Amino acid sequence: MARNVTDFHGILLFRRDYAERDFLIKFFTQEFGKKMFLVRGAKKRGFKMVADILPFTVGSYVGDIADDGLSYIRTARETRQFQDISADIFKNAYATYIMSLVDTAFPDSQPLPDWYHRVQRALTLIDDGVNAAIVTNIMEIQLMPAFGVAPQLQGCAVCGRNDLPFDYSESYGGLLCQAHWTLDPRRLHVSQRTIYYLRQFSVLDLDRLHTIKVKPQTEHALRQLMDEIYDSQIGVHPKSKRFLDQMQSWSARLKPPTDH
């Protein structure tokens, strides 16, 4: 098995206990894609890299990188933790879900520098207070092709027109213009505002996003649409998504009643 001692940049996707004193840590690296690292002695008192391998950490490291199998971290150069994500249970849930999707969407050891940058940018936006639900929607939409689902979102899937109202059709693999709605009696009846955001988010450069305001009803509609597509067409159900759904349910119950 070939190994290479080198610098790398990484986003910590998750960590798990391994044996009595060790951790298995999965990083999404800029240079090598997703890699699993064995960190020996990580649970021992006085371990020097404790702060560098906390959840929601990004930074530069030196590692013994294996082509296949486990790699090893030798030292950390410069790291930082997404503090607000770590401290806020809702931001934490959205960030964990995004990283779960990325981990599921791509094979290990496949360099994906563009996606590394997108994930880092998405986490930065959430950490900075940009609407975590909307950042998550953007990532869900842009990840769909990686799961083998690439809906037609820029024009009608039948005729290509983009000057009429749209609806979403799972049967036709994307948008149907109003002239072809009768072709699919089971189209999703999505609002035009929701369709607008769906189309915009599919091509949005996260580097150009600094703030966004979406009405609560539209945010809810986007969540429903993403759930429908991921449930029926993609079939991916990370544990982190179930926890996120529970969180949203708790939040709805905890909202104070409105006065009439």
UniProtKB/Swiss-Prot annotation:
Q: Which domain of life is it from?
A: Bacteria
The biological processes this protein is annotated with in GO are:
DNA recombination; double-strand break repair
Keywords in UniProt for this one? DNA damage, DNA recombination, DNA repair
Q: One short Pfam family name for this protein?
A: RecO_C
> Any keyword Ribosomal protein?
no
Q: Give the InterPro entries listed for this entry.
A: ARFGAP/RecO, DNA_rep/recomb_RecO_N, NA-bd_OB-fold, RecO, RecO_C
Q: Supply one GO CC term from the record.
A: bacterial nucleoid
Family recorded in the similarity comment: Belongs to the RecO family.
Protein's job: Involved in DNA repair and RecF pathway recombination.
What protein is this chain from?
DNA repair protein RecO
Q: Which organism is it from?
A: Levilactobacillus brevis (strain ATCC 367 / BCRC 12310 / CIP 105137 / JCM 1170 / LMG 11437 / NCIMB 947 / NCTC 947) (Lactobacillus brevis)
